[in-house]
Amino acid sequence: METDIPARLDRLPWSAWHWRVVVALGVTWVLDGLEVTLVGAVAGALIRPDTLALTEQQVGAAATAYLAGAILGALVFGRLTDLVGRKRLFLVTLSVYLVATLLTALSTGFFSFALFRALTGAGIGGEYAAINSAIDELLPARVRGRADLAINGTYWGGTALGALSTLVLLNPNVLPPWLGWRVCFALGALLGISILLIRRHVPESPRWLLLHGRSEEAGRLLRDIEEEVTGRHGPLPKA
């Protein structure tokens, strides 16, 4: 049994491999900031008679549905990530988000809009549960705190992206109102697809594998990581 896996992960110098992990997993905060901003920014468009013709109360209820879905998603997926693994869950939760936000763009009334907002929230809530564990287990302990702070700060990048997107897409001189709000939500799906392609190359957490008695698999994964890092940074220090 390879019991030095945690120490070997912690000794790794910061590398392109770590950047890939941070970008692929840390985008969750960007997506959340984007979604929270979008629903407020498109509210004016959603109450128009030529769009969904929602009331202000229904717009508020849809925002509540998103938050409720996020709480439920965090609880459900948080439990599952310990059972079935980090990688499987962070692929599933991103897929849930991707499909749900795309369906939001195709909503035909209040019920479908609120339902898909709840599912979008569930995907984001599940993302937080799966991603926090994966990031903490894949990054060296010495940089974990700073990395977490930097990643959390990207939430505001998502809000800025949402604000800028709606400023353009909700402009009737750019797109008609019935189409503009739908394209706004479709942006999240496009971003999700690109990130999903990157995440496919992020490995399962060797720490999780070790904890679940799969030490040989954890060792193989870690050797692959070490080989990539060594190719760029030279010999590694002793664990």
Where on the chain are the PLM-derived regions?
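Transmembrane-helix signature of 12-pass secondary carriers
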Residues: M1-A239
